[in-house]
Amino acid sequence: MRCTLIVNRRAGRKGGLPVNLGTADDALAALAAHGIAPAVAETARPGHATELARAAALAGDDVVIAAGGDGTVREAAIGLIGSHVPLGVMPLGSVMNVAHMLGIPRDPQEAAAVIAAGACAEIDVGRAGGTRQAYFLEAAGVGIDAALFAYGNAIDAGRWGAVWGALRLALRYRPRRVVLELDGWRVELPALMVSVANGPFCGAGLRVAPEARVDDHRFDVRVFGPMPKAALLRSLARPEGHEGSEGREGREGREGREGREGHEGQIYTFKARDVRIAAPRGPLPGHADACPLGSTPLRFSLLPGALRVLVGSSAALAGEPHTLASAGPQAPSHPTPAQ
């Protein structure tokens, strides 16, 4: 197997403190134990993993492996959109939403075993547009979460004074009216936040869309309406497998527009490929995979099956994976993002 390991040695640090469960050397040793000897390329700046992944794919690699956190994985993935080259993940970050969604264990030996096994799937990628353009694997959206992510990024960088700003914002934030266009269908309603989810998780492991699947060719659009902040937090921190008050019955026809009222507020779930969000009473902040995106109006579009990935047995998939050898040389019908 010809492959490149893209390494971010700064992954797994929150607030300037190391909190990761492995190192790049652990990843290399685990891969070697499974007979995989990759070329190593280290990231030096933001966006560098995208360049390295694209170069590896063009050079003829069979697999590109990202060793780092969710940010490194997302950057490497962007470089492989539209390529037949699959992405493997060696989790070195503090949260690892993408690894969780793809069924990749945190243990380096177990993660390397997933790569060696070669189970492959084509997953969807989200594209967000507004004042900025961005791709996302987890979720995007607008509202209180987008406003708080800016503080979270400052805290991650060690600026602890941002904690107080985040607390003030959380206490003062009020629902705002939003206008959604979902594949052309329009709805207006009040919301604390709107998540356009490709997968179940975003940010610090928040379960923004428990039923979302990364290969079902639909976004799960979750609208969190007026409710106490504690109820919102409980909903986002809900344990895996517990659906809560809206339940499955609000999602029976997954091709359509769905949702129902929860007993502590309103949480609506919709399915759509193309989502536009506007705020008639002034702009709302947006994010893509917890990174600032600008403000409304924003558009989110889906690239179905745009990224080939190596997955574990517990991946959050709607379909079944196939072996890498049977994937074939055909690339998904999406253009590679411009450099």
Stretch-by-stretch model annotation:
Residues 49, 71-76, 97, 123:
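Short glycine/serine/threonine-rich phosphate/pyrophosphate-binding segments
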Residues 154-161, 202-205, 210-231:
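Gly/Ser/Thr-rich active-site loops/lids in small-molecule metabolic enzymes
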Residues 9, 67-69, 92, 198:
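Glycine-rich beta-strand-to-loop/alpha-helix junction loops that act as flexible
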Residues 141, 145, 195-210, 292:
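Glycine-rich phosphate/pyrophosphate-binding beta-alpha loops
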Residues 174-176, 190-192, 215-219, 271-275:
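A generic structural signal for short beta-strands and their flanking turns/coil linkers
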Residues 1-63, 257-260, 316, 326-339:
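ATP/NTP phosphate-donor binding region
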Residues 182, 213, 223-339:
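ATP/nucleoside-binding phosphotransfer catalytic cores, i.e., glycine-rich phosphate-binding loops
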